[in-house]
Amino acid sequence: MDVIAMDKKNILILSTGDVNGAYEAAYKVAHIIKNMGHDVVMCVKHKTKNENFIKQYRHLSLSSAKANLVMRIVNKIKNKISPVEPSKVISTDMKYSFLSKNEASENIHIESMLKIVGFTPDFVFTGMTIDFLNSTDMLNIYNATKAKIYNITVDMNHFTGGCHYSWGCEGYIKGCGKYCPAITKEHEKITAKNNFERKYENAQKANFQIIAGSGLTLLQAQNSKIYKSQKTIHNINSLIDTKLLNSKNKSIAKKVFSLSNDCFYILTGAQNMEDPRKGFSYLLQALEMLDIELPMQKKEKIVLLVVSNSVNEEFGRVTFKKQKIDYIKDYRLLSLLYQAADLFINTSIEDSGPMMVSEALACGTPVVGFDTGILTNMVIDDYNGYKAPVMDSRKLAEGIRKVFELNKDDYENFSKNAVRQVEEFSSYEYAEEIFKQILEQ
């Protein structure tokens, strides 16, 4: 700690928001680096949390009229050299989450941001910044500060032409061309090509670096045209606070939710189960297979716990006992729910996470799911769960049955291994070591 204190850095974290999913990940990064002894400001478009280190961006009027005049002249020259068209609504296939409409636009005033932040950053870390800033804004920040810039892959957007999920498209590997499956109107498809080329150009000029948020996005970043030449790509694997999410109360967790010790509880869920990326139809198929194959005395022990804001209507046809639980935001209660469950299932077919996988493992709950996202390197067959090929309901059912039929000692080993995997590759302590390496460069 003394070494870090002697070489204290100014760190800027950029994110559209500070709560939920990808925004929560940026908040965790801010906390980890702040606890390492550095000066940290998290600048967001929408502020929800009360912490003082989180500051909301707003455009400030420059005190000097002369400075305003200079900026107007500079912008006028820029627009003459390279005109920037205003962002427009384009027609897209929603499953790709093509949200970056214009990488050439400038969305923030750098002097305003630096004045709000209160220092010139040495390092900048960005997560999800949709509807806030883009790679051109990041280049402008670099030009003004010469800070080292790291983009964190909460999804694929940092190295695509605009989509957050590729669904098999290899544009991020080759460079987005005139054909883009995410954009539905022919004359608008050029948007992806223009975005990608601007992103690539900006990354080269400012030497952007990437940090992976999961095993899958690590592989994708390593193959991407924009970041394939980066020598080392670190992977922070979700970032789990093991002081909150752990297995210390596993022996009493079922009592908290009035669950029976004689039943086997399968936990699954998402904020929106209707999202096709989450692949819940494959879980339904796997459960139907188990319904046919398991003898009645075993089937009666299985209870499905579903956590979601909205439950897919098709879950009504599941014959196993089931119980809906409202989406939980309190991490202490969520930790107890994970500990109360005997198995967590993730059926995402196109996902960079989800964080729920690492959260469940941290609480000593084995995981079964498709080999994508965070499962790629956090779930190990016959160790802490099972991985099935994406969209393979048969293999998914087999993985569920294997965990269900583990004897007590083998299950205990799976549970301990789940915790160990998070402590070694997904904990705050693990992430701190990674950020220490980065900040000491």
Question: Predicted regions span which residues?
Answer:
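A short, active-site helix/loop in glycosyltransferases that binds the activated sugar's phosphate group
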Residues: 160-164, 187-232, 240-250
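Conserved donor-binding/catalytic core segment of Leloir-type glycosyltransferases
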Residues: 259-278, 284-287
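Nucleotide-activated donor-binding/catalytic signature segment of Leloir-type glycosyltransferases, i.e.
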Residues: 298-301, 306-335
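Short alpha-helical donor nucleotide-sugar binding micro-motif in glycosyltransferases
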Residues: 336-341
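Aromatic "clamp/platform" in nucleotide-sugar-dependent glycosyltransferases that forms part
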Residues: 349
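Short hydrophobic beta-strand element within catalytic cores of glycosyltransferases
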Residues: 366-369, 379
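Conserved acidic donor-binding segment of nucleotide-sugar-dependent glycosyltransferases
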Residues: 381-382, 386-393, 402-408
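A charged, aromatic-enriched C-terminal amphipathic alpha-helix characteristic of glycosyltransferases
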Residues: 412-439
